[in-house]
């Protein structure tokens, strides 16, 4: 048995988290995915498997500028996902960090979403 890759380790952590974290219609799950270049956030109702709201740095018309760091872009995505969720009538969510450490871009997204009005 060889050494596991960082991706495999993250997916194992994510599976452990997903055993306990589930989104409901009253309190959907705020999921975060982080790639090397971009960050994605979705608010998901796991009972029906639907994405209710989404935001990312890859969307058309993204207002990010070249001088922003990836952490600052993540904070903008957090603010954007919170605004869209509040427009959709969602105020409470369960945060799913996706197996990533609660640090850096993931933390910036979560804190910006909290400041913009999401409760978790």
From Swiss-Prot:
Task: Supply one GO CC term from the record.
Answer: cytosolic large ribosomal subunit
> Sorted alphabetically, which InterPro entries does this protein's record hold?
Ribosomal_uL18_bac-type, Ribosomal_uL18_bac/euk
Q: Which SUPFAM superfamilies match?
A: Translational machinery components
One of the Pfam families matching this protein, by short name: Ribosomal_L18p
What are the GO BP annotations of this UniProt entry? translation
Gene Ontology terms for molecular function? 5S rRNA binding; structural constituent of ribosome
Q: Which UniProt keywords apply?
A: Ribonucleoprotein, Ribosomal protein, RNA-binding, rRNA-binding
Q: Which family does it belong to?
A: Belongs to the universal ribosomal protein uL18 family.
Q: Oligomeric state and partners?
A: Part of the 50S ribosomal subunit; part of the 5S rRNA/L5/L18/L25 subcomplex. Contacts the 5S and 23S rRNAs.
The job of this chain, per UniProt, is described as:
This is one of the proteins that bind and probably mediate the attachment of the 5S RNA into the large ribosomal subunit, where it forms part of the central protuberance.
Entry protein name: Large ribosomal subunit protein uL18
Q: Which organism is it from?
A: Chloroflexus aggregans (strain MD-66 / DSM 9485)
What gene does the UniProt entry assign to this protein? rplR
